[in-house]
Amino acid sequence: MIPVVALVGRPNVGKSTLFNRLTRTRDALVADFPGLTRDRKYGRAEVEGHEFIIVDTGGIDGTEDGVETRMAGQSLVAIEEADIVLFMVDARAGLMPADEGIAKHLRSREKTTVLVANKTDGLDPDMVTADFYSLGMGEVYPIAASHGRGVTSLLETVLLPFVQDEIEEPVELSEEEENAAYWAALEADEQASEEEAEDDFNPEDLPIKLAIVGRPNVGKSTLTNRILGEERVVVFDMPGTTRDSIYIPMVRDEREYVLIDTAGVRKRGKVTETVEKFSVIKTLQAIEDANVVLLVIDAREGISDQDLSLLGFILNSGRSLVIVVNKWDGLSQEVREQVKETLDLRLGFIDFARIHFISALHGSGVGNLFESVTEAYACATRRVSTAMLTRIMQMASDDHQPPLVRGRRVKLKYAHAGGYNPPIVVIHGNQVKDLPDSYKRYLMNYYRRSLDVMGTPIRIQFKEGENPFADKRNTLTPNQLRKRKRLMSHIKKGK
């Protein structure tokens, strides 16, 4: 399960600045849900190859009324959902009564909490953080989020211990070693592709994890019940690693599925109303754990910014996608045409996803969903050999040559598979990281057409060897030095 990190503190202590600093590693804010939790932001961060979900809980006003009553219900649940809480304070403003109130609340929750003193740039960190030790939160980590100072140390000390995978240090290679590594990697990948037929892994043997997500009241629960009702299976709760989600096994056409329900299919006595409404964290985790995501959209309300934010998170997660437009029944032909035009306009950038128009209430169109689900899963888990990927890369290069970079043509050497669900193509070559985005999109679309991929995004990664002589000046040989000396002497005599 991807760890969840909540940023907590008074207003204007720099939580949003740190949030942007962390999520910028993925080049954007991943998701923004103004309709569910006002002025809250949710994003994905990557620290040395490990992913985290970052939650900006907004400002908490701990006044004389007490933090317990002044804190928004959604923020309370965000803290409960978090694996780590970064409690941020303002080093320039010093210790405030609100900080003490928030600290008291956090201590009562017994959460893993790290005290972060922001805005220490230009100040003596030891001096400005001394007062905060009285909060009893342990070590104080001074940072300057706006400049990034101290953030790396904070991440390495606080976040990385939550992941167990060891990170290998990069090894510098000489030019000969780099060339040998290219051919060795190519040979190894070709050998691996030949052994694929003997590989014990078969995606068909595993159940397809299907997450049903969307805004409130778009019909997620109705669709879940319709799917289960049609199949007449015994529904039981199977607890999983993603908290606050219910895993429901089912069988359809002799194919096993696991529905990940994010609509709160639980006993009402075990949850509070606030927890029930706060579905952001469990939705994000359900997406991460799923193989295929059904994004449900209300045909009567159209596509909202919240739908696009959720869609952006799905795409960045690399999950297969099927778009479901619900409540299609009862709409006039004119309204249906308008809805389709809006979908084409706002969802034109995801032309790889199938769109289904259904009525979960009456069941029309629901049965056809599973054709697209199985197609998307098959495309996402299909094994493709190194020889095939390299041949497609060469065909794409022949049809449209890579551009010149600093006067030299970018050279694509070979390609191989780097992962599945989503499919990842790794292209090796010289200066490949300098390719413009337009050519990268061209390669991605070329692979999609050539492999006939539907329902899942394709990711392309570029790798190149470092030139060990890039920063070294050429040294003259003894003969060249003598020749240079004679030329300089001749020039001086001529003057």
From Swiss-Prot:
> What sequence ranges are listed for the domain KH-like?
382-466
Q: Which InterPro entries match?
A: G_ENGA (IPR031166), GTP-bd (IPR006073), GTPase_Der (IPR016484), KH_dom-like (IPR032859), KH_dom-like_a/b (IPR015946), P-loop_NTPase (IPR027417), Small_GTP-bd (IPR005225)
Q: Which GO terms describe its biological process?
A: ribosome biogenesis
Domain of life assignment? Bacteria
Q: Which residues bind GTP 1?
A: 9-16, 56-60, 118-121
Q: Which Pfam families match?
A: KH_dom-like, MMR_HSR1
The UniProt record gives the binding positions of GTP 2 as: 214-221, 261-265, 326-329
- GO molecular function per UniProt: GTP binding; ribosome binding
The record's similarity note reads: Belongs to the TRAFAC class TrmE-Era-EngA-EngB-Septin-like GTPase superfamily. EngA (Der) GTPase family.
SUBUNIT field: Associates with the 50S ribosomal subunit.
Among HAMAP family, the record links this protein to: GTPase_Der
What is the name attached to this protein's record? GTPase Der
Which organism is the protein's source? Pectobacterium carotovorum subsp. carotovorum (strain PC1)
The opening ranks of the lineage are: Bacteria, Pseudomonadati, Pseudomonadota, Gammaproteobacteria, Enterobacterales
